[in-house]
Amino acid sequence: ATAAWLAVERLMQKMLGDTLGYGLYPSPLMRQAADLAGSAGLTGLLLLSNEALAAAWAQHPQGIRALLKPLALGLAAPLLLLVYGGFVAPVSPITDAKPLRVGLIQSNLVDYERMRKEQGALAVVRQILDTHYAMSYDAVEHQRVDAVLWSETTYPTTFGHPKSQAGAQLDQEILGIVRSARVPFVFGTYDLDDNGEYNAAAFVTPQQGLLGLYRKSRLFPLTEYVPPWLDGPTFRRLLPWTGTWQAGSGAPFAKTTHNGQA
């Protein structure tokens, strides 16, 4: 049963890339074994432990002796995880470093498509950005944050690859806001290349501007991505809000200097 479960998780696409092993994340010791077999290995151990406990329950009418072996096997997996984690878990260094304070900006502006139809694309972008500018100013000047995070797709057009002169001006405006704030910004936007558009997150610093873009690699089915066999004019007419983004390759990497600059 455990092998079948793991095989199905590996071969069948799921809406979300979750697995039972993720449930061990809150335990600093039990999650360490992921360096040996990944999250799938943790899932396998959890399933084996549950199979052993189920076998013990099935044998309980036969008395205590019949329970001992499956119970021992069921408890062995979590004990092994704890023991291994105790040996390899990193010791938290004693440091006086200040924790990173991040300002999460949530404007509660929703349904961009409806707003675009009612106000026009440029007016909507203007409203979204002005709202985030004001909230970011409060976060930087009054809350003294070290970085600012604009949640969701705050900038609903391509950043760094403007499609128009107005888009290029908005890009420069955002860069100017980041320079004035003197802290890094991360925000949702779109990216563009010859293959199409990507749902992305932009990393912008005061010193260097656009540091890089993360292209989302796991798109949400029927919202951000439609399988080719299902896509078509009829589908788009019935669900016009469905996205057409491409799947990205994951997180970018940047070299940093000794003072933290990329």
Each PLM stretch: what is its role?
Residues 1-262:
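Enzyme catalytic cores with a strong preference for nitrogen-chemistry domains
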